[in-house]
UniProtKB/Swiss-Prot annotation:
Belongs to the major facilitator superfamily. TCR/Tet family. It comes from Bacillus subtilis (strain 168). Disulfide bonds: none annotated. This is Uncharacterized MFS-type transporter YfiS. One of its GO terms (molecular function) is transmembrane transporter activity. The gene is yfiS. InterPro entries: MFS (IPR011701), MFS_dom (IPR020846), MFS_trans_sf (IPR036259).
Amino acid sequence: MEKPLFRNQKGLMTLLASQTISSLGDWLHILAVLTLAAFQLHASPLDMSLLMMSFALPVIVLGPVSGLLADRFDRKTIMFLSEIGRALTVISCVYVSELWQLYVLLSVQSCFSSLFLPAKNGKLKELAPEAHIQQAVSVSSIIDNSSKIFGPALGGTLIAAFSIHSVFYINAGAFFLSAVILFFLPRDAFLQKANTPQEKTAALTSIKEGLQFLKRMPLLLTGLLTACVVLFVLQIGDSQAIILIRSFSGAPPELAGWCMAVSGAGMLLTAAITGRRRITSYLLYFSAGTLLLGLATGGAPFLSGMGIAGITLFIFAFFIMGAAFGLVHIPFQILVQTTVPVDYSGRVFGAIQSATTLASILGMAGGGVLAEWIGVSLAFLVCGCLLIMIGLITLIGKKIAESRRYLVTKSNKGAQG
């Protein structure tokens, strides 16, 4: 009989507990920073875009380096220092009086944040039993997506009940608590072997090795490209939803918030389902997720003239978008965890973090440009058609790969006979 995931897994439970608090802290901080910029520092739309860029750009640049550090040094120590750094940066936001100060602090915090994810993912692979790695990744995804739903809601409640500055103090406390929990994690088991003089290599060479590992695995590369395209379109949807909502008569002002919340709920549902089903074909998940996202994105503009029913279906479309993204993102994370050796995982996850963050930025920026150029409704439709085409290509690729495997197997059997 198969043992439950968390039986005798104190280290894994400690890591996930720290991740839960840290992820909530991330979403509390995002809401508090946006509120501070918009209502106290009177940021313009361009200022808000620069604010998001100052948070995202360091992740893109430092992703591969952070991954290398996660493979070279103790991941527990890296995560601990990352949380302490984020806590101190968050407290500093209380004393901000100019927007440029907020840009600097967000960039510094982003540098600390970029250290956390590759180290956490590498530690997850190290601590989770091989037989339960799929469940562990699903639980980790459930934590992240639950935080996306409950973090902003909690942050809004705290801001309404107290003040923005109070939320910064609470947020810093969350990061400090996460650091305290991380103190009880075991040190990395693979470090003693990985850091022997014979195996030490130059930093740039190590980063290249991580990127080359991705190139050598066609399925991993396909998953990464699909995840980036899907994330790109999802960010267009999130960033331009408020513009599309203007075409809905009688739409409540909080509709954009509902759309973002149900998108997180869709990803949460997918994470829960994926953790219970053994994945036999990753390409099937990639193609299904891309097709569903294409249908939901392309169909959203046609709902604007349907009154209350259209608004309800529009919210449901964002639920489908979130679930569809989960069908690509979560199996891809499982694929990486199950195929990448533990001493390469930091570098590979660092490269993935850079690529997906770049896709998010391009989605946020490109969505505005595309909507200005051809109109927001047509932008949704074009993106939907593009995704459907990519989903069909992936599905055809799956069929071709299966046919080749069948022919090879049949040929081998004939040769043996």
